[in-house]
UniProtKB/Swiss-Prot annotation:
<keyword id="KW-0206">Cytoskeleton</keyword>
<feature type="compositionally biased region" description="Pro residues">
    <location>
        <begin position="160"/>
        <end position="171"/>
    </location>
</feature>
<dbReference type="GO" id="GO:0005938">
    <property type="term" value="C:cell cortex"/>
</dbReference>
<dbReference type="GO" id="GO:0005829">
    <property type="term" value="C:cytosol"/>
</dbReference>
<feature type="compositionally biased region" description="Low complexity">
    <location>
        <begin position="236"/>
        <end position="253"/>
    </location>
</feature>
<dbReference type="GO" id="GO:0005813">
    <property type="term" value="C:centrosome"/>
</dbReference>
<feature type="compositionally biased region" description="Low complexity">
    <location>
        <begin position="125"/>
        <end position="134"/>
    </location>
</feature>
<feature type="region of interest" description="Disordered">
    <location>
        <begin position="236"/>
        <end position="256"/>
    </location>
</feature>
<feature type="region of interest" description="Disordered">
    <location>
        <begin position="117"/>
        <end position="192"/>
    </location>
</feature>
<dbReference type="InterPro" id="IPR025739">
    <property type="entry name" value="FAM110_N"/>
</dbReference>
<comment type="similarity">
    <text>Belongs to the FAM110 family.</text>
</comment>
<dbReference type="GO" id="GO:0000922">
    <property type="term" value="C:spindle pole"/>
</dbReference>
<dbReference type="GO" id="GO:0005634">
    <property type="term" value="C:nucleus"/>
</dbReference>
<dbReference type="InterPro" id="IPR025740">
    <property type="entry name" value="FAM110"/>
</dbReference>
<comment type="subunit">
    <text>May interact with CSPP1.</text>
</comment>
<dbReference type="GO" id="GO:0007052">
    <property type="term" value="P:mitotic spindle organization"/>
</dbReference>
<dbReference type="GO" id="GO:0005876">
    <property type="term" value="C:spindle microtubule"/>
</dbReference>
């Protein structure tokens, strides 16, 4: 039977004018079937037509229930655990706690130590208190225990620092002796030998550069000294062993700054030295040719 068939006694559709009846679709003009009865679902329609496609009589007579998800029926907590969680815990009320009584003797001794002024003898012994920190405090004479209301707050005040002692003034000997440099100290003999060796090497190089000793002696000491005066002056204060010894003794009594100030800087470049050597050789040549021109 079609669903849209009207049942007898169903209320008819309301009367509409002709011009509206021709324009409205027919399915809108029909009233609800079975007086507004619910439309069967697809499962119900299949259940009604089961005999058409099921051959077994047992299956046709049984009704299939909708599938429901499996729910875990086991409780999350055991009854004992739930009972212990839900029931309020009854703890035994602790008895009246007894506070430790204050030792009034120790408290009074602390008050006396903080209130008493520090004597100068104790202030002078203040640096040594760190060594005897583990020693017990000196015993104080017993006093009658004061009442609880007489106990006042202990204010710990820092001890006054001991006055700084003035540094002893250095003696006249210490003031007169100059400060020695902390570096390596060389002996006088080592320094004099070093300066004399450097002076001898420098003098040998400039006096006999390109000349044999016999040829230099043949030219004469006066010509040699006159020609090489501007070159030998490079030796500075270390021109001979005697002067180096005197300079060494003088340098040993001055500080590092004065020694650096007195040191002669050798700022002569290589070009200037070569020019002086060429000039010196040229002077030797002129000194050699002058006796030949006079003879």
């Amino acid at each position: 039977m079609p669903v849209h068939t009207l049942s007898p006694g169903a209320p008819s559709a309301p009367a509409l004018p002709c011009r509206l009846r021709t324009r409205v679709p027919g399915y809108l003009l029909r009233g609800p079937a079975d007086g507004g009865a619910r439309k069967p679902s697809a499962v119900e329609r299949l259940e009604a037509d089961k005999a058409k496609y099921v051959k077994s009589l047992h299956v046709a007579n049984t009704r299939q229930e909708p599938v429901q998800p499996l729910l875990s029926k086991q409780p999350l907590f055991s009854p004992e655990t739930r009972r212990t969680v839900l029931t309020p815990s009854r703890r035994a009320l602790p008895g009246p706690c007894r506070r430790p009584q204050l030792d009034l003797d120790i408290l009074s001794s602390l008050i006396d130590l903080c209130d008493s002024p520090v004597s100068p003898a104790e202030a002078s012994r203040t640096p040594g208190r760190a060594e005897g920190a583990g020693r017990p405090p000196p015993a104080t004479p017993p006093r009658p225990p004061p009442s609880t209301s007489a106990v006042r707050r202990v204010d710990v005040r820092p001890l006054p620092a001991s006055p700084a002692r003035p540094c002893p003034s250095p003696g006249p000997a210490a003031a007169s002796s100059p400060a020695r440099p902390p570096g390596l100290q060389r002996s006088k003999s080592d320094l004099s030998e070093r300066f004399s060796r450097a002076a001898a090497d420098l003098e040998r190089f400039f006096n006999f550069c390109g000349l044999d000793p016999e040829e230099a002696r043949g030219l004469g000491v006066a010509h040699l000294a006159r020609a090489s005066s501007d070159i030998v002056s490079l030796a500075g204060p270390s021109a001979g062993p005697g002067s180096s010894e005197g300079g060494c003794s003088r340098r040993s009594s001055v500080t590092v700054e004065e020694r650096a100030r007195e040191r002669v800087p050798y700022g002569v470049s290589v070009v200037e030295r070569n020019a002086r050597v060429i000039k010196w050789l040229y002077g030797l040549r002129q000194a050699r040719e002058s006796p030949a021109a006079e003879g």
